[in-house]
C-alpha cells in the first residue's frame, strides 16, 4: 500500500450489490481490529452531501467492475484526502472490454495518487449472480487491513482458507430448496451472530440474484426475538441458521432451533468451525453450494435474467464520463 493509504486514520467506505458486504466487512475490520475509524455510506449518500462531510478522510470504494453508480463516489474523490478503489477492473481490462471511458477514469485515479487494489475476477458478467468476486473481495479487505502496523486481524494462510472454501450446505437444506422451492421463494429467515450480521448482505442477495427469490431477512440471534420470530410464527417460513465456533453462539443456535421447532418452523443449521472474520468464507461457499444446486434443479436461466437491459434508469444513474 502507498504511504497515503497507510497513514490514513479515518475512512468512509462504500459499495453496492455484493460490494456492500465487502465495504461493511472492511469497516468492521478497521473499527474493531485497528486503531482507525471507518463509516459505511451507501452510494446515494454521495449525491448531495456537502464537501465538509468528507474533509481529511480517505474514501474507499468497492466495485468489482467499477459500475456506473460506483463512480458517484469516485467523482467525490476531490473532497477527500485520499481515495482507494477495490476492483477487479484495470485500465487494460476495461479497454479490452470496450469501455475506454472507464479505462481512462482508472488511469486518472492512479495519476491523481489514488490507489487501485485489485482482486479477481474481471468481467464476471455472463450471469447475474457472481461467485468468484464476492469471496475474493473479503480476502482483499482482510489483506488490506493486515498491512496496517497495529492490525489485530488474522491473515489466513492457504491451509486455513482451503477447507472453508470447500464448505457444503447440509443435504437436507439442498433437498428442501430443490424440492420445496415455494417454501423459500417468498423469503425466509437468515439468522446469525454479530459481527457476521453486519456484513452478510451477499449471503442473502445470492438467493435473489441466483434464483430470483425474495431476499431473506437477516437477523442477529438476539434481534430475532424482537419481531422476526413473531412475524414468522404468524406467517410460517423456514430459517437458515449460521453457526461459527463460539461457545456463546452454540447456545444461541440451540435456543433458536428450539424456539423455531416449538412453533412448527423448519430450521437448518450451517456450521463452519472458524471465528467470525474467517467463517464468512465458509458460509459463502456453503450457500453457493445450495444456490447452485437449486439453480441446476430448477433450470434457472442466469444468462437471460428477468429485467435484463431494462434497469438503466437507476443502474446507470451515473454514466461513464
Place the predicted regions along the sequence by residue:
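Active-site phosphate/pyrophosphate-binding segments
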Residues: 1-9, 113-235, 313-321
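Glycine-rich phosphate-binding loops that contact phosphosugars or nucleotide phosphates
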Residues: 6-158, 235-273
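Conserved active-site and cofactor/substrate-binding residues in soluble primary-metabolism enzymes
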Residues: 17-21, 25, 132-139, 194-198, ...
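Short, well-ordered alpha-helices that flank and scaffold nucleotide-derived cofactor binding pockets
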Residues: 28, 32, 205, 209, ...
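Secondary-structure boundary/capping signal
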Residues: 34-38, 211, 215, 302
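Short secondary-structure transition/capping segments
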Residues: 51-52, 97-98, 227-230, 281
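Short active-site-adjacent structural elements
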Residues: 225-228, 249-251, 276-281
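Charge-biased C-terminal accessory regions appended to nucleic-acid-, cytoskeletal NTPase
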Residues: 261-321
